[in-house]
């Protein structure tokens, strides 16, 4: 099958943005980009018949500081501008809500809910995607001394989060690199169970880099990648 979906991980992070978005250039301290990468990616996705998902802007500060409405307002303005400028592309098939969380963090579901619903309303109900991560043994927080979530705790917290974002999120694609290989299947089974409960599609974000190494991030070896692919297959993931 090859590659049929391309996701822009973020429209920007902090000062760096992927295209000259006027709503960000006018309000945020960002650098002017030399190339319109969004137009380039969409044109190529059109050419090769791929589905393109546009990723939101991550301020790198507001939502971490609890200033959720600031993050929401920036992204709502971005959605309006992006859809008006790029919505004619046949490959523009959805939106990626790019703020990454692992648990009930500072009421983060508010961003998913409001931004997701706005994106869908502007674009004629295009698909929305999130890719959170599992709060497992390989997260920065746990390696710094926090406690990893058990499978049961993961299910309880994400049941609450998904209930809060009903109608705003269509696809859930958890990153798979923050738990050990022998634990992954159990978490994926819960992800699929929750996705089914809330009528969402369940993909998996298979990371092709290695979190076990002291350098961020070396390519993963095939044996590890195969273990993750097999766990995804057995758990019933719809796309990887």
Model-derived regions, located:
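Glycan-processing catalytic domains of CAZymes
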Residues: 1-240
């Amino acid at each position: 099958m090859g590659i049929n979906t391309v996701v822009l991980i973020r429209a920007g992070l902090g000062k760096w943005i992927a295209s000259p978005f006027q709503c960000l250039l006018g309000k945020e301290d960002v650098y002017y980009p030399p190339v319109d990468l969004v137009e380039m990616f969409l044109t190529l996705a059109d050419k090769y018949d791929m589905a393109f998902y546009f990723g939101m802007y991550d301020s790198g500060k507001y939502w971490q500081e609890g200033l959720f409405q600031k993050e929401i307002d920036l992204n709502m303005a971005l959605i309006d501008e992006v859809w008006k400028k790029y919505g004619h592309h046949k490959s523009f098939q959805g939106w990626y809500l790019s703020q990454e969380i692992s648990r009930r963090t500072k009421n983060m579901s508010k961003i998913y809910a409001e931004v997701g619903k706005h994106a869908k309303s502007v674009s004629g109900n295009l698909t929305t995607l999130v890719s959170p991560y599992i709060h497992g043994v390989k997260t920065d927080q746990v390696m710094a001394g926090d406690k990893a979530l058990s499978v049961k705790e993961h299910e309880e917290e994400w049941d609450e989060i998904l209930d809060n974002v009903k109608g705003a999120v269509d696809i859930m694609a958890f990153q798979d690199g923050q738990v050990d290989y022998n634990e992954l299947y159990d978490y994926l089974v819960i992800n699929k169970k929750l996705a089914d409960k809330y009528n969402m599609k369940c993909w998996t974000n298979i990371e092709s880099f290695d979190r076990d190494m002291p350098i961020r991030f070396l390519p993963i070896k095939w044996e590890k990648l195969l273990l993750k692919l097999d766990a995804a297959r057995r758990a019933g993931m719809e796309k990887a």
